């Protein structure tokens, strides 16, 4: 098994861990509907950048 020659310092350890932090999801608000959605994703209503891309299907609950 490999063993390092000398112990890594607290500074080196911290520098290595500096990229490990988790970020929250980037959310945007659609200008047309005001819906919140993930960046670069379509909103639940089918809008992207203010234009309707898809027409949403009727949900199962609406058919009953």
From Swiss-Prot:
<keyword id="KW-0687">Ribonucleoprotein</keyword>
<dbReference type="GO" id="GO:0003735">
    <property type="term" value="F:structural constituent of ribosome"/>
</dbReference>
<dbReference type="InterPro" id="IPR002677">
    <property type="entry name" value="Ribosomal_bL32"/>
</dbReference>
<protein>
    <recommendedName>
        <fullName>Large ribosomal subunit protein bL32</fullName>
    </recommendedName>
</protein>
<feature type="region of interest" description="Disordered">
    <location>
        <begin position="1"/>
        <end position="64"/>
    </location>
</feature>
<dbReference type="Pfam" id="PF01783">
    <property type="entry name" value="Ribosomal_L32p"/>
</dbReference>
<feature type="compositionally biased region" description="Basic residues">
    <location>
        <begin position="1"/>
        <end position="16"/>
    </location>
</feature>
<dbReference type="GO" id="GO:0022625">
    <property type="term" value="C:cytosolic large ribosomal subunit"/>
</dbReference>
<dbReference type="InterPro" id="IPR044957">
    <property type="entry name" value="Ribosomal_bL32_bact"/>
</dbReference>
<comment type="similarity">
    <text>Belongs to the bacterial ribosomal protein bL32 family.</text>
</comment>
<keyword id="KW-0689">Ribosomal protein</keyword>
<dbReference type="GO" id="GO:0006412">
    <property type="term" value="P:translation"/>
</dbReference>
<dbReference type="InterPro" id="IPR011332">
    <property type="entry name" value="Ribosomal_zn-bd"/>
</dbReference>
């Amino acid at each position: 098994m490999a063993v390092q020659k000398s112990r890594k310092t607290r500074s080196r350890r911290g520098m290595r861990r500096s990229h490990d932090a988790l970020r929250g999801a980037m959310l945007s608000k659609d200008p047309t509907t005001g819906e919140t959605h993930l960046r670069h994703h379509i909103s639940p209503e089918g809008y992207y950048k203010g234009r309707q891309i898809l027409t949403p299907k009727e949900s199962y609950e609406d058919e009953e």
